[in-house]
Amino acid sequence: MSRQINAVTPSSSSRRHRLSLSRRRINFTTSPEALPSSSSRSQPSSSSRSQPYSSSRSQPYSSSRRRRRQERSQEQRVSEDNVQIIGNANEPLTRTYHSQGVTYHVHGQVNISNDDPLLSQEDDTIESVDRASQQYQNSIASETAAQRALQRGLDLESQLMSEISPRSPAYSPPYPSNDVLSQSPDLFDSPQSPQQHELELEDEDEEEEEEEGEEVEVSCNICFTTLKDTKNVDSSFVTSIDCNHAVCFKCYVRIIMDNSTYKCFCSASSSDFRVYNKHGYVEFMPLTLIRNRDSIKQHWRELLENNTVNNRIIDLNDVERLERERSELRAKNSQVEHKMTMLNCDYAMLKHEHKITELKLKWANRDLEEFTKKTQELQSTVNDLQEQLRKQVAESQAKFSQFERRNSELVAELYTIEMSKP
């Protein structure tokens, strides 16, 4: 059995309540309208987009595109959470099962054995699941029909509103000869053609957003002014339809003002011009030429009032303040550099003094060791002399006592002799 499941399978306890094909084979053949396919699930999003499309001129295109993208991602997450695929998803759908709030799609010829835990119930359970799946398919079919009716009503309402609403004074119809969108017959095949066109534009915008634009420096062929444009996205140059020499807008206006007709440096004259961007190009031609030196002054006056914040006094004050701050920072930087130089000098001197002190300490330790040795030698000599002196004193005392005793004996003997004489 080869089976591929693209979602988290339920636990073993919930598998006991699923379909069983041990005694008979269940084959649900559902029509494409009743299947919970991506088209039926995307109906609410398309219906929700139909009304904003009728008023797309009053809302920014970026916000509606972001909302549609969020709805699409949310629907995709919900569909992926509730659908499991068995078999190869590239093969055609053969069977569909629904149990425990999860829809199982079987693609291709999948051999499912009778001992599969997905199919572990008796016939009565099969009949109940059969009825539940039939009710689910009926509810899906009714919901799909209601969504289609709602979508049809919204499309008719938007079509009526577009026909009834008056056009604005600034409305300019597209050129039927050059506009590719107006020539496409697909826009008039069904009431959902505006939504399809909008989805196509959205897909194109998403593809363009994924591609990172490369900024390229391009120079004008006349004034050689270098402009930076994004490759394959936008262009700041005007191109004649008779030659391929692109010029900037300033040179184009100057040539028109000088010659009344545009004549390129390659001697090619033309009255039609093109300006390109990522969506296509715009053809235009100069209609009216008015020579008035005050018009540029009025134009710049409006630019300074509406497009820029250009106050000469404020700019000068800012420049003076920045110059002052730069001077102060330079002075502080000089002081810091001077302090760093002094500190480096002090550090070098302290480093030398440290080395000298270490050398002196080494010498002092050596002298201390020598003095300690000499002191120990002298101490041993003093001890020897003291011992010798003690011995000499003891010998002297013994000798003196012996002399005294002998002297007393001799004196007594002499006295005895003198007394014995007649």
Swiss-Prot record:
GO annotation terms (biological process): symbiont-mediated perturbation of host ubiquitin-like protein modification
Q: Which PROSITE patterns match?
A: ZF_RING_1, ZF_RING_2
Q: Where is the composition biased (Polar residues)?
A: 1-10, 179-196
Which pairs are disulfide-linked? Answer: none
| Record field: compositional bias (Basic residues) | 14-26
Query: EC class of this enzyme?
Result: transferase
- Its catalytic activity? S-ubiquitinyl-[E2 ubiquitin-conjugating enzyme]-L-cysteine + [acceptor protein]-L-lysine = [E2 ubiquitin-conjugating enzyme]-L-cysteine + N(6)-ubiquitinyl-[acceptor protein]-L-lysine
Q: Residue spans with biased composition (Basic and acidic residues)?
A: 71-80
Superkingdom field: Viruses
Q: What Pfam family is a match for this entry? A: zf-C3HC4
Q: Give the location in the cell.
A: Host nucleus
Query: Which coarse location class describes where this protein primarily resides?
Result: host cell
* GO cellular component assignments: host cell nucleus
Q: Which InterPro entries would you find in this protein's record? A: Znf_C3HC4_RING-type (IPR018957), Znf_RING (IPR001841), Znf_RING/FYVE/PHD (IPR013083), Znf_RING_CS (IPR017907)
Coiled-coil segments, which residues? 314-414
Mind telling me how this protein is modified after translation?
Auto-ubiquitinated.
E.C. number: 2.3.2.27
Question: Compositional bias of type Acidic residues: which residue ranges?
Answer: 200-215
Q: Which GO molecular-function terms appear in the entry?
A: transferase activity; zinc ion binding
- In this chain, the RING-type zinc fingers fall at 220-268
Chain positions covered by the region annotation Disordered = 1-86, 165-215
State its role: RING-finger E3 ubiquitin ligase that plays an important regulatory role during the initial stages of infection. Migrates to specific nuclear foci early in infection supposely to prepare the sites for viral replication by targeting and ubiquitinating host proteins.
Which family is this sequence assigned to?
A: Belongs to the alphabaculovirus IE2 protein family.
Assembly, in brief, is: Homooligomer.
Protein name per the record: E3 ubiquitin-protein ligase IE2
List the source organism.
Bombyx mori nuclear polyhedrosis virus
